[in-house]
Amino acid sequence: MPAKGPLTPQQLSLINRYWRAANYLSVGQIYLMKNPLLREPLQPEHIKPRLLGHWGTTPGLNFIYAHLNRIIQQRNANVIYICGPGHGGPGMVANTYLEGTYSEIYPAISEDEAGMERLFRQFSFPGGIPSHAAPETPGSIHEGGELGYALVHAYGAAFDNPDLVVACVVGDGEAETGALATSWHSNKFLNPARDGAVLPILHLNGYKIANPTVLARLSDDDLDNLFRGYGYEPFFVEGSEPADMHQKMAATLDTIFQRIQDIKKNADVHSPERPRWPMIILRSPKGWTGPKTVDGLVVENYWRAHQVPVANCRENDAHRKILEDWMKSYDPSDLFDEKGALKPELRALAPKGEARIGANPHANGGLLRKELHMPDFRQYAVNVTEPGAIEAQSTKILGDFLRDVMKLNETEKNFRIFGPDETASNRLGSVLEATNRVWMAETLDMDDHLAADGRVMEVLSEHLCQGWLEGYLLSGRHGFFSCYEAFIHIIDSMFNQHAKWLQVARELEWRKPISSLNYLLTSHVWRQDHNGFSHQDPGFVDLVANKSADIVRVYFPPDANTLLWVGDHCLKTWNRVNVIVAGKQPEPQWLTMAEAEKHCEAGLGIWEWAGTEDGLEPDIVMACAGDVPTMETLAAVDLLRQSLPHLRIRVVNVVDLMVLQSPHQHPHGISDEEFDRMFTTNRPVIFAYHGYPYLIHRLVYKRTNHSNFHVRGFIEQGTTTTPFDMTVLNELDRFHLAMEAVERLPLGESVAKPLIDNFTEKLALHKDYIRQHGEDMPEIRDWKWTWPR
């Protein structure tokens, strides 16, 4: 009896053949290197020596792709496809090949038998392409190697893209991750009047690598209740018989796309109701249409289908026969013509031009990227008449600047600010003068700065902030992410994956540059004295420094004017990850705006006004990177100038950390000659650094004077205490820095010992004072730089 549904018998036959073609190409990529159309009996030499790839999820991905093509054609829909199970890469490559996008981008992979052979051979092969939906895959903005981020990327791409539908396949294994579990709440931030739609497709094929999945073992009632609780309207598509499943999927997508159209049509621009967005729960067999058993063991609809369901096909004749029968079951002669091209009636099922999923410009966001309209950062300058004479909250000044970036780009609607409930805490609250926090859930009369059309995105999940921003950037927009320094570690591995994506994408001429991912790390280690050890960790920078030098930049602006320059610069860059570390508390302001510009452009500099070298070779170099280390260094210099008035001191401040490397290691690196001019070739260098000391040693280890670098920083000593005591516990304070300088100088015991005794006594007084009074000593709290220029 014919399956019932919206597809005519002819349409059903065509879409099933298209699906078979995608499945055939997927299997071919995993197994074959020759004889792509099986026009001769399958021989061992036709098969790859190493069989790599994942079959289990792939037929389901191909099934979804074929039906999205149909709905794009039928409704002239604007759709991109996020493949959460990115290990189903063979399917994504196969479908972009069938629609013609792949051959347009990679002409050597032509639409004929020779091109198909190259398509098969290159997959997971040296000199070829990776196994996942990597940057090399047209239409992909999500590799799906590390699981958990598909849905949050989908929402990021949908924000401010009102005509876009982001179809997002969530594997049932990925659905067990923490990041994905919280991503379902992204619908509370999606405004149907100004944003696109996200269509989650939860693919329940039942198994992970070697275990069942949790959601697949829930009843339909439990799943329905779960996702209705999240605010979705689930539609179930379940089965294993292809004709029946095609009809169900076609009918479901017809209903859902009409539902999306109605939701958007009825949305009020200013006060839209939060709709119950549709989603699909697709139950289909893992390894669908593949071998049912191998060697008497169940494969289809079981975890054994996950990767390569038939192994050792070169060596094992029986296995090779299973593979050949499997591939022939798709009947390639019914799918491809004599030349090896997809038959015209099947090619007609794919959309044309940019309507193709693989050619959609939203999945190559650099094509759509527009430069931000930027205010002149100099207008926000702090008026510094003398170094250290006044204090300011650097991030508050930056917040004023970001507020006006928001205002200037309101028409374009291509800039958002992200943070895990920390925008106000991080002193960026000025941005709320220009916009609100986006919020589509219930509001109360007492709520402030919550609105459906807000452009500040706050949720207490660093995973969501990072993922939304990545999706937003990858689809062509701009953003800024502020976070407590210690808790940015929560997204360490998300940063890793994005940096890897950027590194590969930079090498692909067809992938146009996207806006940089900009982090502001504040509420940092040296001012988390009130929250304690759990909040004290500057190590994210160490992770960042491991990545490709072409990708990462790390900045430690010491005051507000340098922070303004750095913030402006980072928002104008592309294909980078920029990390800015700056404090939010009141702190001394050192440089005029003119000085700040010159200093930041160089990345580091000698602060002649702070030193005493008078044009001669210094006796010692006092170097610093970071706002608190800068203040403590200058306080140490103050002590040394008072104690040793004839000592020649040079003060070097580093704002762009990567300048410490050589130009061969990093494009911002300074030459050996410049480094030696700055740090000398034989004088002691006392380096006060914001983070873990070893990073500085690592960056400078090839320099002439490396053996004379004595770096102090965070040495994993923390608690709830006073701000100054944090530096004392880690021996980064002015007294330890001054003692280190005295010990490294050839002063003689008669000069050095009284100084060291004095500084040691000061530390003892400090310890007693804070335990008695609960705050730092007045001479610490009230210290100011008083030396004239």
Swiss-Prot record:
Family according to the record: Belongs to the XFP family.
Cofactor(s) needed by this chain: thiamine diphosphate
An individual GO BP term: carbohydrate metabolic process
Enzyme class: lyase
Species in which this protein is naturally found: Brucella suis biovar 1 (strain 1330)
Record protein name field: Probable phosphoketolase
Xref: SUPFAM superfamilies: Thiamin diphosphate-binding fold (THDP-binding)
Keywords, comma-separated and alphabetical: Lyase, Thiamine pyrophosphate
GO-annotated molecular function: aldehyde-lyase activity
InterPro entries named in the record: Phosphoketolase, THDP-binding, Transketo_C/PFOR_II, Xul5P/Fru6P_PKetolase, Xul5P/Fru6P_PKetolase_C, Xul5P/Fru6P_PKetolase_CS, Xul5P/Fru6P_PKetolase_N, Xul5P/Fru6P_PKetolase_ThDP_BS
Keyword Transmembrane recorded: no
